[in-house]
């Protein structure tokens, strides 16, 4: 049976945390900030965590990462 390959686009977007979670960055942060409040922009700068419902699928894409 062939080895699983890491999905390279996903590997660039997610980082593993110490407890085995996955860290991600928020969407809507590249342009068009004039429609967002100061609070929204500040909160979008912080990283988020991958939800439990998406975790299994993303872990499978990142199977080759340590």
Curated annotation (Swiss-Prot):
Its taxonomic path starts at: Bacteria, Bacillati, Bacillota, Bacilli, Lactobacillales
Q: Which GO terms describe its molecular function?
A: structural constituent of ribosome
What family name appears in the similarity comment? Belongs to the bacterial ribosomal protein bL35 family.
Ribosomal protein: is it a keyword of this entry? yes
Q: Name one GO cellular component term.
A: cytosolic large ribosomal subunit
Q: Which GO terms describe its biological process?
A: translation
Annotated keywords: Ribonucleoprotein, Ribosomal protein
> What PROSITE patterns would the database entry show?
RIBOSOMAL_L35 (PS00936)
Can you say what this protein is called? Large ribosomal subunit protein bL35
Spell out the residue ranges making up region: Disordered: 1-66
Comp. bias intervals (Basic residues): 1-16, 23-45
